[in-house]
Swiss-Prot record:
Family from the record: Belongs to the MraZ family.
Localization annotation: Cytoplasm, Nucleoid
Highest taxon above the source species: Bacteria
Oligomeric form and interacting partners: Forms oligomers.
Organism: Natranaerobius thermophilus (strain ATCC BAA-1301 / DSM 18059 / JW/NM-WN-LF)
UniProt-recorded Gene Ontology molecular function terms: DNA-binding transcription factor activity; transcription cis-regulatory region binding
Protein name: Transcriptional regulator MraZ
Domain annotation SpoVT-AbrB: ranges: 5-47, 76-119
Primary localisation category: cytoplasm
GO cellular component: cytoplasm; nucleoid
Signal peptide: none
Any one biological process term the GO annotation gives: negative regulation of DNA-templated transcription initiation
Keyword Transcription regulation: yes
CDD domains tied to this protein: MraZ_C, MraZ_N
Amino acid sequence: MFMGEFRHSLDSKGRVIVPAKFRKGLGDNFVATRGLDNCIFVYPMNEWKVLEEKIRQLPLTKSDARAFSRFFLSGASECELDKQGRISLPSNLRDYAALQKDVVIIGVSNRVEIWSQEKWDNYQQQAESSFENIAEEIVDFDI
């Protein structure tokens, strides 16, 4: 399970250090793709295979299912860590997530997300202001 928030810098070659806490969970090979909210989703290979199978089962007759499949899968890239624990992010994903220099890497249960620091800070500020309302609407956990 991935959790936590880490701030790092993207180097001139589009590489970013993956927090040591996440490296073991991601394994040697993993998949990065366009995520929701203009961030990058990063999945360990076992989680990716489960997700890919669910996408494969979407009905081809529905245009929304085809659009989602195309968007999600066409942006996917198999990645690996280098010896320094960095991931080299493809330019299409960096452009999609508007990654410049400062990035935020967060753990979200079964995946890792990579955000531009500016977008993450804005998103977090909005989410904090409405967290109680969101919790009332979607959470029924007694926490």
